[in-house]
């Protein structure tokens, strides 16, 4: 159950005062353990104070350099240590990447994310220059641009910022305690150090994790605690449902997808602890029913990845998401559109203008 203090804070405090960076692990655990129907209601109430609940950003993720990674992340298809059938490729040509970005924008995506499978950028000067050029070109399309390129130093972060990068993704993956069971080639503190370098360069941070790695609920709480107690909350927190990859240690050990209720608890808890953050329903969404996805939006998720692929795993198609949005009265979020609440100053719900109302569905 919610403690009286937390319940009173949600009901009585101004929206601004709900933003905290001093959450204790015990507080987050109590929030997580709240009966789910009450937890989602309270998360939705906070969500409406900071965001338009009908707005969901569509993002597209492209692997611009696939496979051959030297890291040993035990869930990853792109690690060279496991026999997953993924072939290593070179960096995509600039024109090929830009064509993918144009398609994504035409389909409704307003954030274009690019991932490269390697540990860090050290010794990749020519490749880094090509990536900087890609960032400049995609940004000129009036899209948000995010990349995930492994660990980086402060100077590299500044160069990315100068090129027009919106945000950098560097996930924590799981709790500090469970982390060593998943990865041994990079420490938790190295991940936090990269995030610190991003902040110093003035970049927005995208950092979240993967649920269903075999972790326990206290590990999900631990992940949220690590994110919610950062000096500045990540502007973006992606939650991934594990997609088991045959040939990886985790993929061979985990036979079933994590049930939806702990995933919803994690989204709702993160929404309460980080009310201004964009929470992204990332990998594994294709394994969820439409109703399960809608519950995630009610719990506080307000961004999805859509398109052809999630790096090496299946994504939900643009056409499927178009139907999903229609059925549930959702709208795509524009680039750089954040924090548009539909509540009045007193917390009352305000109907949107008529032109923004979705057509009445047939069912």
Swiss-Prot record:
Reactions catalysed, as given in the entry: (4R,5S)-dethiobiotin + (sulfur carrier)-SH + 2 reduced [2Fe-2S]-[ferredoxin] + 2 S-adenosyl-L-methionine = (sulfur carrier)-H + biotin + 2 5'-deoxyadenosine + 2 L-methionine + 2 oxidized [2Fe-2S]-[ferredoxin]
InterPro entries assigned: Aldolase_TIM, BATS_dom, Biotin_synth/BioAB, Biotin_synthase, Elp3/MiaA/NifB-like_rSAM, rSAM
Cofactor(s) for this UniProt protein: [4Fe-4S] cluster; [2Fe-2S] cluster
Biological processes per GO annotation: biotin biosynthetic process
GO cellular component: mitochondrion
Residues where Phosphoserine is found: 13-14, 17
Cofactor binding comment, as recorded: Binds 1 [4Fe-4S] cluster. The cluster is coordinated with 3 cysteines and an exchangeable S-adenosyl-L-methionine. Binds 1 [2Fe-2S] cluster. The cluster is coordinated with 3 cysteines and 1 arginine.
EC numbers on record: 2.8.1.6
Region (Disordered): 337-363
Superkingdom of origin: Eukaryota
Function, in words: Catalyzes the last step of biotin biosynthesis, the conversion of dethiobiotin to biotin.
UniProt-recorded name of the protein: Biotin synthase
UniProt lineage: Eukaryota, Fungi, Dikarya, Ascomycota, Taphrinomycotina
